[in-house]
Amino acid sequence: TWESLYSYVSGKDEGGNIVHATARLSATSGSIIVCKDAKKLVIVKGLKDCMVVDSDNVLMVCPRQDDAVKEILVDLTAADKGEYL
C-alpha cells in the first residue's frame, strides 16, 4: 500500500515528503512526488498528504490514501483504460 511505502521509505525531506524527481516544493508536507523524466521539473506548492506520480503516459495527483488509489484503479478498469495501469 502507499501508506506502507510512505512509512517504510527513509530519506524524507524536512517536510516529510518522499521525492524521487527533479522538484521544487513549497509549503508541501507528507507527500510522495515521483517523476520518471529527470529532465522534467516538478513544481509543487501547498499540498499535504498527496501523491504526484508522473510516468510515461500518466500523471496522477490524488490524496495519499489507499482508498483513493484503489478507486482510481477501479474507475480506469471500468472505463476500459487498462493500458494506463
Question: Where does each model-flagged region fall?
Answer:
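Left-handed beta-helix
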Residues: 2-85
